[in-house]
């Protein structure tokens, strides 16, 4: 198993704390509504569905408070910057923000289902009591406060002639209307967040996610009508439950048992969510302010395999390696923002991104930049671009290790372009304070053309390290995962040439996929008693493989080899 705690210990601790708080809130509120004297008569009317509705409501408040925080990108970047003195293992938790966001969303979905189903039973019990087909106790409780301005218990205020009137009661009350609206919003948000829709129909995902505005407004006013009611404190003092609970016929007739009075709980949800909503509002204001700052496209480069490079300048823009930005092109869409990893280095006087053309928005940007035309495009014809960021990622920590493994799959190589460029600049400037001593770089790609735009950078690094007698600083392995028979024959013919036929590098391209178990064991033997950073930008399947290898090849004890796995998430 290796040292599992090295990679996952803190993450599991955070998750257990979160789950523990959910369990605590559920049990605590369940006991209040299932055992508390305040809700004794409410339980007589509604049964166990009362507690089963209110306990998940408390958990919903808690999780709806949390759901916005992981997507406050500027807040996370601030925390990452302010925690620079902390352990990389602590900062890694910030890089799992989207994973936590999804977990909280599923928890909200679970408690919404329980809350909704329980309240459907509550509506039925209330309506049955008003219709007169319930037990006499429930009917008597429902008759309390039938007149105006009296302190009633049953929210179904008028006697219903139609026994099927439950639906009517539900959809004519504020709680019912808002409950239906926010549940529909939640269903649309979750169903449009599947991997297939995010990748193939990002616009659908983006627009439906903004239903969260309606969701939170509905959530804030959901309890304003106070339909879940309990006995007032004054009534509990006057109306002794031990004496009066079984003497319903004598209520109001004997001094010891006055008619009980009821009141609804004041709305609480807004108190839970007002703080995160304010933070998120500030987040959006910062994003809007940044989006209004002028961005100049200085160069557009068309690379093979339908990839374009945008080089841009923006006043006051400062970046670190591996960071990402959000880009909006009003000519393509006035509302949509899309994330892209920065491929430039902090030492350069511009910032750049590489964009693979795979969807409607990227196709629109490709055409707006004139990349679909053969002739040269004048700078004044280039579209206006808005940029929000940069935002921090796990790759910022790459210089915190002496040894790192960088693994990129396809276009996922982009964050490592920034890192390798920065390394090259640091060596050009004779940087002596560089902690990083060894880079193992792996690039997996299925098409030969995809290597072309990155080969120049690797050649520069290869030459630079040889000139400085430090050729061992960078070990890179490029894997071609897709080829046909004619390509294989061509590669075989040119195998003995000094430079690789695909990349033009001295290091030959490998075919197939790495044997990760061998790679990790070899690196572990080369660097005993070392903490090694493993950085991935690639698919989930590869992330799972590398995470398992990092755990299984890490040794127990503080002086052993430790592989710390990091994955890009945005």
UniProtKB/Swiss-Prot annotation:
The keyword DNA damage does not apply. Its EC number is 1.6.3.-. FAD binds at residues 199-200, 337-339, 341, 354, 356, 361-362. Its main location: membrane. Residues 54-286 form the Ferric oxidoreductase domain. It comes from the Eukaryota. InterPro entries: Cyt_b245_heavy_chain, FAD-bd_8, FAD-bd_FR_type, Fe3_Rdtase_TM_dom, Fe_red_NAD-bd_6, FNR_nucleotide-bd, RBOH/FRE, Riboflavin_synthase-like_b-brl. It is a multi-pass membrane protein. One of its GO terms (biological process) is positive regulation of angiogenesis. Residues 287-397 form the FAD-binding FR-type domain. SUPFAM superfamilies: Ferredoxin reductase-like, C-terminal NADP-linked domain, Riboflavin synthase domain-like. NADPH binds at residues 411, 446, 481, 513. Heme b 2 binds at residues 115, 222, 226-227, 268. Residues 37-46, 131-163, 223-267 are extracellular. Residues 2-9, 73-95, 195-203, 286-570 are cytoplasmic. Glycans are attached at residue 40. CDD domains: NOX_Duox_like_FAD_NADP (cd06186). Its cofactor is FAD. It is an enzyme of class 1 (oxidoreductase). Catalytic subunit of the phagocyte NADPH oxidase complex that mediates the transfer of electrons from cytosolic NADPH to O2 to produce the superoxide anion (O2(-)). In the activated complex, electrons are first transferred from NADPH to flavin adenine dinucleotide (FAD) and subsequently transferred via two heme molecules to molecular oxygen, producing superoxide through an outer-sphere reaction. This is NADPH oxidase 2. It comes from Mus musculus.
